[in-house]
Regions:
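Short, recurring structural edge motifs at helix starts
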Residues: 220-221, 246-250
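Ferredoxin-type iron-sulfur electron-transfer modules and their immediate structural context
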Residues: 2-169, 173-175, 181-227, 232, ...
């Protein structure tokens, strides 16, 4: 009985070895040799595999760069590596790279513990996604930050952290690569990737679409859709009780004035972003 079992085990092991050898031979026979240039392109990439470029990962992006003609190549961008990496790849291909505008994530909410105090106690799983399924919000704002830091957990570059005093995320502009993981993760769509214009940004830090009086009861920093910003720049959209500043609006030309004129300080204007690392 034992000898028969032992024989069966040996047969199975033998078959496994034979199968492994056959698989190896087959893989070598049909192996696709990489071009030295394609290999060099892959090695030039940051290997973050974040998907911010729109491809499955760095290997997929390297293949796309290698196969691209001049027009296609100019449309390819590596947000993590930036212009330095794309210039290196362009040199390898003997092509010109497209222009890359610096961008970073912004949090379109200023629902801090002070501006939007808790009105309900949440005792469930400490996750934004979990909390979002069972309640409108700790402060009563149905669109505000839930303050559990799901975004922080998915940021692989250490660009996000929770401010213990305010309760909302802090963005380190020097580390943000615009990979978009925070945009995908936030159940309330509070993150947006926006351009940095000469070290400046301007945006509305609110997504509450309740009427002004109601919104202000839940958060003192809520947009009241007064329309003052739209009078400064007609490109600004005010609808559904909320203002939105398109990325075509110049932060350099209008940013400071827009922030100063906003009566509830819902418009945030950032400057000297090369030196100032954090959003407060």
């Amino acid at each position: 009985m034992i000898s028969a079992l032992f024989s069966n085990i040996l047969v199975l092991c033998g078959l496994a070895v034979i199968a492994a050898i056959l698989l190896y031979i087959t893989s070598q026979k049909f192996k696709m040799e990489k071009s030295p240039i394609e290999e060099a392109i892959y090695n030039a990439l940051p290997h973050a595999n974040c998907g911010a470029c729109g491809k499955a990962g760095c290997q997929d992006f390297a293949v796309a760069c290698f196969k691209a003609d001049q027009e296609e190549f100019e449309s390819l961008k590596c947000p993590v590596g930036g212009s330095a990496v794309m210039t290196k790849i362009a040199d390898l291909k003997g092509m010109k790279t497209g222009t890359m505008q610096k961008t970073c994530a912004v949090l379109r909410c200023n629902g801090t513990c002070k501006n939007a105090p808790d009105k309900v106690e949440y005792t469930g799983l400490r996750s934004c996604r979990a909390a979002n399924t069972v309640m409108s919000g700790r402060s009563g704002c149905p669109n505000g930050c839930l303050r559990f830091g799901d975004c922080v957990k998915v940021c692989q570059f250490g660009a996000l952290s929770l401010n213990k005093e305010t309760g909302i995320p802090i963005i380190d502009y020097t580390k943000c690569t615009s990979c978009g993981k925070c945009v995908q993760r936030c159940p309330r769509g509070l993150f947006e990737i926006r351009p940095i214009e000469e070290g400046q940004q301007v945006y509305v830090a609110c997504r509450n679409q309740q009427k002004g009086a109601v919104a202000r009861k839940n958060c003192t920093a809520a947009c009241i859709a007064c329309g003052k910003c739209a009078k400064i720049n007609p490109e600004i959209i005010v609808e559904n009780n909320l203002a939105y500043i398109p990325t075509t609006v110049s932060a350099v030309a209008d940013g400071e004035k827009l922030a100063a004129e906003c009566p509830v300080k819902a418009i945030h204007y950032r400057q000297n972003m090369q030196e100032n690392k954090h959003e407060n």
